[in-house]
A protein has these predicted regions:
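C-terminal and inter-domain tail/linker signature
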Residues: 1-154
Length: 154
């Protein structure tokens, strides 16, 4: 059993307990954040909060993909909505987590989870992790004249 799963199944883990499992340079990829995050000090509070936020449920699957990579599936409910997470965890030679990538479904439950996490962590994380920046005109947004030209060519 992966140490993160074992810790979460034992109850609500503390920040210190979560921190002990993480490599200093851990990378976290989550659909509730606009970009990957890196570093134990930034990520440990997120993992701790998510254990308290995500509601009741159980791990239903665990597979070792190779000697350092684990797949976990968790199913539960949050505010009465079915909630499912799938994650891939990569550990280093010392058994510390170096990368964690999560997928969450369905969308309504993901949104509830994201909103709850935002409320709990908005002042603890940089603002740019919550929203994608608005595209500039140079990044693919069409100007009015270009739109008219495209429509005229159809």
């Amino acid at each position: 059993m992966h140490p993160l799963r074992k810790l979460r199944e034992a109850g609500k883990p503390t920040l210190a307990q979560i921190s002990e499992l993480l490599a200093e340079n851990i990378v976290f990829n989550s659909p509730i954040l606009a970009r990957p995050l890196q570093g134990r000090e930034l990520i440990a509070p997120i993992f701790t909060q998510s254990s308290q936020t995500r509601g009741s449920g159980t791990y239903t699957a665990e597979f070792k993909l190779d000697e350092r990579t684990t797949f976990l599936r968790w199913v539960g409910t949050m505010d009465g909505h079915k909630f499912e997470s799938m994650e891939i965890i990569v550990d280093n030679e010392q058994g510390l987590i170096t990368e964690r990538t999560i997928a969450l479904r369905p969308y309504p439950a993901l949104k509830l989870f994201r909103d709850a996490m935002y409320a709990a962590l908005k002042d603890k994380l940089p603002p740019d992790v919550w929203e994608y920046p608005a595209p500039s005109l140079n990044e693919g947004t069409l100007q009015a004249g270009a739109t008219q030209e495209l429509v005229g060519n159809l």
